[in-house]
Amino acid sequence: MNFQSNISAFLEDSLSHHTIPIVETFTVDTLTPIQMIEKLDREITYLLESKDDTSTWSRYSFIGLNPFLTIKEEQGRFSAADQDSKSLYTGNELKEVLNWMNTTYKIKTPELGIPFVGGAVGYLSYDMIPLIEPSVPSHTKETDMEKCMLFVCRTLIAYDHETKNVHFIQYARLTGEETKNEKMDVFHQNHLELQNLIEKMMDQKNIKELFLSADSYKTPSFETVSSNYEKSAFMADVEKIKSYIKAGDIFQGVLSQKFEVPIKADAFELYRVLRIVNPSPYMYYMKLLDREIVGSSPERLIHVQDGHLEIHPIAGTRKRGADKAEDERLKVELMKDEKEKAEHYMLVDLARNDIGRVAEYGSVSVPEFTKIVSFSHVMHIISVVTGRLKKGVHPVDALMSAFPAGTLTGAPKIRAMQLLQELEPTPRETYGGCIAYIGFDGNIDSCITIRTMSVKNGVASIQAGAGIVADSVPEAEYEESCNKAGALLKTIHIAEDMFHSKEDKADEQISTIVR
């Protein structure tokens, strides 16, 4: 174990900072993020992971607990509620609240060589669009879900899957009015809390680990599933979008439907299964005020790192082959598919425009164009669009410029969003929005909220869509949206079977295989 913080450094840091990290780092060989969370009795706020062994993006897991600040949108304004002082700050824009946080709390960040050492983590819902683009109206139906919810946690566990290093970070908070002895008391109290947390990790608590063959489960039927769309109404709206395309209003529109299914499994059980069934570069479990979010997204929205901007447009998909030869054949087939390539080119143009609005003139480039990247179950055509953030432009402005992703709206983006607000019967909530971390250092990583479940009061909500173009067949587009939801319904089916329907049998089958 390597203790990186000492009281002398803490006292020196306290002269210019009010929020100071206490850090301990050690290396593990068997302890995993899932085991850690079970040892904490699942009393966490979020888990962010990258889990796809074939992807170069997969390396870290971040566990946040003990939130001290909650940021959310309320009636067009953003508020930050401090759980300790019970104070409340409000501002007109998200970046205003984040600037207030950094100025007020005077946060020092540890230098650990990892991409995230603390900050605001949560979601921006699709329904936030009218706050960013006033020409897009709010949906006519109400939703009880906040348009934005971000948590700033006192404690962060950062797990490096490559080095097996685990960093425990505890942010000690000062007011700036303490005496030296009072500062020492704060240090010792936070150090003790950190030690207690680490001791829980060393606990020999028996953790039940999943043993399952995900391939043995077929995608379940939709018998117990309800939708906000009748099939005939969905197909009629496909025809309406095609008429708008024919009239020249848009080139593409992404029409979606929301499925709901009653469940017995809890959200973390769903997450444990999802990370096996559908591992992806962006995986997340979040415990909100009144619901939980579970997701596995393959697609980045935007990445901001020290002023470097990056978007990875994804469009064009094939399933992985059974062997190398079939994989290669499918890659060639995908790259010859003119429809898939045309959609991809459109998304690259959208990404260039999104970055161009906030980038230094002449800095936008496409260093990788139409590259095929393989994931665990599928392969995608992916490009990389980059730029350099303009001086004086806030990193959150880059996030807002890219939000929402064109892959979930269509193009041109604004007109497509206007039409979708008219056609879709209910607000999208998280679907098509983003999950993001906004670091204390201003760096951001975010993914598009797809392949995601929202769990509330024993009901899982799943939304999936289809990209409508001029020659779309309504029946096929309806089936595509159902097929996309099927992967998550499969997750629910497995979790119910493993944890609830056959609990006695499950206990016998549980063994160490996947962490």
From Swiss-Prot:
Top enzyme class of this protein?
Answer: lyase
Q: Which GO terms describe its biological process?
A: L-tryptophan biosynthetic process
Tell me its EC number(s), please: 4.1.3.27
Q: In which pathway does it act?
A: Amino-acid biosynthesis; L-tryptophan biosynthesis; L-tryptophan from chorismate: step 1/5
Which residues does UniProt assign to the signal peptide? Answer: none
Give residues annotated as binding Mg(2+): 343, 480
Residues binding L-tryptophan are 50, 281-283
Q: Does the keyword Magnesium apply?
A: yes
Q: How is the cofactor bound?
A: Binds 1 Mg(2+) ion per subunit.
Catalytic activity reads: chorismate + L-glutamine = anthranilate + pyruvate + L-glutamate + H(+)
UniProt keywords (A-Z) are: Amino-acid biosynthesis, Aromatic amino acid biosynthesis, Lyase, Magnesium, Metal-binding, Tryptophan biosynthesis
Question: Subunit info?
Answer: Heterotetramer consisting of two non-identical subunits: a beta subunit (TrpG) and a large alpha subunit (TrpE).
Q: What does this protein do?
A: Part of a heterotetrameric complex that catalyzes the two-step biosynthesis of anthranilate, an intermediate in the biosynthesis of L-tryptophan. In the first step, the glutamine-binding beta subunit (TrpG) of anthranilate synthase (AS) provides the glutamine amidotransferase activity which generates ammonia as a substrate that, along with chorismate, is used in the second step, catalyzed by the large alpha subunit of AS (TrpE) to produce anthranilate. In the absence of TrpG, TrpE can synthesize anthranilate directly from chorismate and high concentrations of ammonia.
Which family does the entry's similarity section mention? Answer: Belongs to the anthranilate synthase component I family.
Name listed for the protein in its UniProt record: Anthranilate synthase component 1
- Gene field: trpE
